[in-house]
C-alpha cells in the first residue's frame, strides 16, 4: 500500500495530467484514507468504509488517464473495467462478479512479482549453479578402481566458468536444460454466469501432468532468465501468497469503473435500458459490500474503493438509479479543455506528445524542433476542430499531430537534418483542412 501524502500524489499526477485539480485532490485523499484506515485499531478499522467517487466530465479530459496513473502510484490491487462490458445476470455477457475475480488475479500477480523480487538474488545464484552443472557435468567413474577427478581442479575450473558466465562471455553459447513443462491452455466455452466453473476446469486440465519437465535448447542468456524465474517461483510459498492476496484485495483493493454513464437510463426510452438498469442493480451489492466466491476463496467487498467515471453526454448522473447514486457520495466534475490547456499538454507532461514525436524521428536522423508559435497554432486548430465537430478533448491532438507530421514521417529515411515546426508550417499543412468543415469532419 502506498504511503504517499495527498500533496505528493497530486504532484506525481501533475507530471502526466494537465489541470483537473479537483479530481486529482479527490483521488489523492481517497488513496491516503486507505493508508489512514490501516493505522486504526482493528475494531474501528472494520467500521470505516471507503467513500466512493463519481468523476463527471466530457471525453478526453483525463478521467481514464488519472486511473492509469493512480494504478501505478497505489501499489495496491487495482483494476480498470468498462461498465459497458457487463450485462444483467441472465443476459449474454459477463456478470459483474467477474470484476472481483479479475481484481484477485491482479492482486496475486502483483504480490507474486513483489515476492519474486525479494528472492531474485538467491534465484539467480541457483540458476547459475544449474547452468554450470550443464557446462561442467560431473565425470562418470569407469569402474571400482578408477580415480575420481581431483576436487580442487574441478572447483578451479568451475570458478573460471563462473567468472566467464558473469562477464557475459558465454551468453551466445547454446545449452540443453531441463525446465518445467508449460501447461497446455484449454479454451472452454460456458454459458453466461458459469465463468467460475470454466476457470476451475482450466486449472484442472493444466494440472494434469503437472510436475513434468522438458528439455529445451537455448542460448545461455535466455536459459538464465528462464531458470531464474523457475527458481524464484519455487522459492515463493504459493499457498501463503494466495491468502495474502485475498486479504490485500479486501483491505486495499481499488476498482475503476469507466463509462458508467453508458449504463444509465436515458430519459424515458425502454428496450435495452432494462439490461442497463440490471447492470446497475447488480453493481449495488458489490459497491455496498457482499461476498464473492473466487477460486482463491471468498472475498468480501466491504472495504474495496470504487471510482466510477463517465462523460454523461446523453444522460445525467441523476439518471443512475437512486441506490447507486447514494453509494457514490463524492462527486467531482472535470472541466473541458481550452486552447491554453492544449499548449500545456503538448509541452509540459513527462514524455509529452512533442517529445515523443521528436524522439521517434530522431531515430532516423531527423531533428524536429517545435517552435512556441507552432505549438500554440496546433492547440488553436485542435480547439477549433473540437468546437466545430465532436469535442473529443485532448485526443484531438493525436489526430492533428499525425496529420501534421505525415509527410515528414514518410520522407524521414531520405531526409537528414533539422526541421522546424512553426506557425507557418502548421498553417501550410492544416489550414485548408480546417477551413473546409466537411473535410475536417472526416480527416481531423
Swiss-Prot record:
The keyword Chaperone applies. Keywords: ATP-binding, Chaperone, Cytoplasm, Nucleotide-binding, Stress response. GO terms for molecular function: ATP binding; ATP hydrolysis activity; peptidase activity; proteasome-activating activity. Disulfide bonds: none annotated. Pfam families: AAA, AAA_2. Signal peptide: none annotated. GO terms for biological process: protein unfolding; proteolysis involved in protein catabolic process. One of its GO terms (cellular component) is HslUV protease complex. InterPro entries: AAA+_ATPase, ATP-dep_Clp_protease_ClpX, ATPase_AAA_core, Clp_ATPase_C, HslU, P-loop_NTPase. ATP binds at residues 18, 60-65, 258, 323, 395. It is found in: Cytoplasm. Belongs to the ClpX chaperone family. HslU subfamily. ATPase subunit of a proteasome-like degradation complex; this subunit has chaperone activity. The binding of ATP and its subsequent hydrolysis by HslU are essential for unfolding of protein substrates subsequently hydrolyzed by HslV. HslU recognizes the N-terminal part of its protein substrates and unfolds these before they are guided to HslV for hydrolysis. NCBIfam families: hslU (TIGR00390), PRK05201.1 (NF003544). A double ring-shaped homohexamer of HslV is capped on each side by a ring-shaped HslU homohexamer. The assembly of the HslU/HslV complex is dependent on binding of ATP. This is ATP-dependent protease ATPase subunit HslU. The lineage of its organism: Bacteria, Pseudomonadati, Pseudomonadota, Gammaproteobacteria, Chromatiales. The gene is hslU.
